[in-house]
């Protein structure tokens, strides 16, 4: 009896140890200790971005503003999805990024969060929502995460107040991406959408600002529209990844605006041409225009919808009853038109008409 009990206890202990060993092979992703199974669709983390950076593997980032664009970015396996305030221009049609509000940005953030399950999600802090005080900056960042479903925020510029804002947001436990060089929210100071770092003082300022953002705790810095040597210097000087847009090939990663890289807006009213730094990987705008023109033509010529796109049927007996009810209501013409349409659809469906 005692020997049997010992064997039973040992057997249960062995199974328990086996279970523990098996589960310990799965990485623990939270401080609460719940081991999670590895999943190819698991959200990209800051740790993974740092690992890519250390290995010298380029980081990919693309903007998204709604559910469909987020799904496409998710499917492509892009590392980071930025809900940019560029939505003001490419979605809302403004000339600059300045008019978009926090409430509008939150709508975009929520839509993207529903569509992009894998990329790290970064939301821009729109102009006027973080400049007045550190409290305002932290409150806005909290809303972008809690209400927008983002994983991190991005803010522009490197003035002392922006550096302080970045530091305060990081201290509040929120990951921050910085942005230097051409900062669209500062176009009134910069004199328009102009490249930065083209002279000694400006180039040094780009590098120093990027370093200050790193010191403030930013996990990454966007370098926009600066000469490649300046971007290379900033990338070398930093321990965090740089993400270039119009900054040459020497950054830790690259970002482009969704609409620009897909060629969706051949003649945007806010720019004479697509930005010089942007490669168009498709001409989606032409495809859209062609499809819309074809649709318009087919509807105008009564070619759409045809039988193949009119799938819902009514039985002959129900049709007869329906026509009878129309006649009782005094809708003789409606009954006649309904009967004629049914006859026409039957003729279209017959083998001889195929």
UniProtKB/Swiss-Prot annotation:
Query: Transit peptide: which residues?
Result: 1-50
| The keyword Aminoacyl-tRNA synthetase belongs to this UniProt entry's keyword annotation | no
Q: Does the keyword Oxidoreductase apply?
A: no
Positions bound to Mg(2+): 85, 124, 156
Q: A single Pfam family, by name?
A: Pantoate_transf
EC no.? Answer: 2.1.2.11
Q: Which UniProt keywords apply?
A: Magnesium, Metal-binding, Mitochondrion, Pantothenate biosynthesis, Transferase, Transit peptide
Q: In which pathway does it act?
A: Cofactor biosynthesis; (R)-pantothenate biosynthesis; (R)-pantoate from 3-methyl-2-oxobutanoate: step 1/2
Give an example GO biological process.
pantothenate biosynthetic process
The record's principal subcellular location, in a coarse class, is mitochondrion
Question: What cofactor does this chain's UniProt record say it requires?
Answer: Mg(2+)
**Which residues act catalytically here?**
224 (proton acceptor)
Q: Which domain of life is it from?
A: Eukaryota
The protein's matches in SUPFAM superfamilies, at most eight in alphabetical order, are given as: Phosphoenolpyruvate/pyruvate domain (SSF51621)
Detail which positions bind 3-methyl-2-oxobutanoate: 85-86, 124, 154
- Record text on cofactor binding: Binds 1 Mg(2+) ion per subunit.
- GO MF entries: 3-methyl-2-oxobutanoate hydroxymethyltransferase activity; cobalt ion binding; zinc ion binding
Where is it localised? Answer: Mitochondrion
Kindly state which reaction or reactions the protein catalyses: 3-methyl-2-oxobutanoate + (6R)-5,10-methylene-5,6,7,8-tetrahydrofolate + H2O = 2-dehydropantoate + (6S)-5,6,7,8-tetrahydrofolate
HAMAP family on file: PanB
Q: What does this protein do?
A: Catalyzes the reversible reaction in which hydroxymethyl group from 5,10-methylenetetrahydrofolate is transferred onto alpha-ketoisovalerate to form ketopantoate.
Q: Which family does it belong to?
A: Belongs to the PanB family.
Protein name as catalogued: 3-methyl-2-oxobutanoate hydroxymethyltransferase 2, mitochondrial
Query: Gene for this protein?
Result: KPHMT2
